[in-house]
């Protein structure tokens, strides 16, 4: 009887430990994405355009200290020369990647951000309004 009670107590404690650990938020994925972004340039469309409404492709350089730069080029430029350079601050929390370009630009957030190999995908929000799906590809 004592052995059975001891066994049930151990089983109860194991179940309790598993149950409590599953209630904690999983920041492991945030750390993985945070560590994956620096290195290379992430190229794709983030909705930027010039004064004449010509679309620009963004090339994002992420640094490990939460800052980065966006080198933008015209889609139809065969040489891919940089037309604009914009600094930004970035962070990730709860699978939301925030790109803050400062007061003169809207806050960009990529929800449900997912990195698989050299592709980053998610849903782009501009100042809190959904813009649509986005995908960036890493180039070296």
What are these model-predicted stretches?
Residues 27-43, 140:
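N-terminal helix-cap/turn-to-beta initiation motif at the start of protein domains
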Residues 48, 57-61, 67, 96-140:
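Beta-sheet ligand-binding and adhesion/scaffold domains
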Residues 38, 42, 66-68, 120:
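Structural detector for hydrophobic anchor residues on beta-strands
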Residues 18-22:
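C-terminal motif of bacterial Sec signal peptides marking the signal peptidase cleavage site
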Residues 2-10:
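Bacterial N-terminal signal peptides that target proteins for export
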Residues 52-98:
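N-terminal glycine/threonine-rich, aromatic-flanked beta-hairpin/loop signature
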Residues 9-17:
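Hydrophobic helical h-region of N-terminal Sec-dependent signal peptides
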Residues 31-34, 89, 112:
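Short secondary-structure boundary/capping segments
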């Amino acid at each position: 009887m004592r052995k059975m009670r001891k066994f049930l107590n151990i089983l109860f404690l194991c179940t309790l430990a598993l149950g409590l650990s599953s209630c904690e938020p999983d920041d492991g994925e945030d750390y993985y994405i945070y560590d994956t972004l620096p290195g290379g340039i992430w190229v794709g469309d983030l909705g930027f355009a010039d004064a004449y409404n010509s679309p620009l492709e963004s090339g994002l350089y992420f640094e490990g200290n939460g800052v980065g730069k966006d080198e933008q080029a015209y889609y139809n430029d065969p040489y891919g020369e940089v037309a604009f350079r914009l600094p930004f601050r970035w962070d990730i929390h709860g699978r939301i990647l925030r790109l803050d370009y400062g007061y003169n630009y809207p806050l960009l957030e990529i929800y449900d951000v997912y990195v698989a190999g050299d592709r980053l995908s998610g849903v782009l929000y501009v100042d809190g309004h959904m813009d649509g799906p986005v995908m960036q590809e890493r180039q070296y």
